[in-house]
Amino acid sequence: PQIVDRLVWAGGLTMGWFSSLLVLTILRDVALFITDSAKWRVDSVLWVILAASTITVIGFINARKTARVKRVDIPITALPDALNGFTIVQITDVHVGPTIKGEYVRRIVRRVNNLAADAVAITGDVVDNTVDILSDQTAPLGQLRARHGSFVVTGNHEYYSGADDWMAEFRRLGLKTLSDEHVVID
């Protein structure tokens, strides 16, 4: 329900703000103790509140952006020529749930598909709730395209949310699920 999602957002923002406030207050207190500077005591409270608020707003803005692409080249000695330039796109920690919805997943899928990868590896923590609640939100994952397929393994959040059901749902979407196993790509 939308009210629950809004409460989760509000709770997350509040928790983030209080966490920033706590750390900054401790740093402020240490600085005041070391410098024994009473003249900054009142003004520094306002600066701490402003800084915690700024950090929270920046965190909120960053959380709403589509995940970034980071290119990592992994040199492998004696790599067969046929595998030179083989690309794997890794997707991890999407956490679809109250704050991450299907549109965000669609943007990730579009970005990944534009990379024209040889394989896609989804390495867990895709979801933060059960299949019956989130299957519509994760459906765009079925549109992932890679020459050798898209593979998924579970993370701890899938276990919190019914790992067996999620593995079945991922298979239904056309993803190749791996559980204590490997595959050989030809």
What are the residue ranges of the model-derived segments?
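Long, contiguous hydrophobic alpha-helical segments, chiefly transmembrane helices and signal peptides
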Residues: 10-25, 67-69, 94, 121, ...
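Non-catalytic terminal accessory segments
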Residues: 1-65
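Sparse, context-dependent recognition of short Cys/His-centered cofactor- or disulfide-binding micro-motifs
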Residues: 42, 46, 52-59, 73, ...
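Hydrophobic alpha-helical transmembrane segments in integral membrane proteins
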Residues: 45-46, 54-79, 98-103
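Soluble catalytic domains of enzymes that build or remodel membrane lipids, polysaccharides, and related
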Residues: 78-186
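Short, functionally important structural connectors and interaction interfaces within domains
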Residues: 2, 59-61, 66, 75, ...
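Arginine residue identity/basic-tract feature
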Residues: 6, 17, 28, 40-41, ...
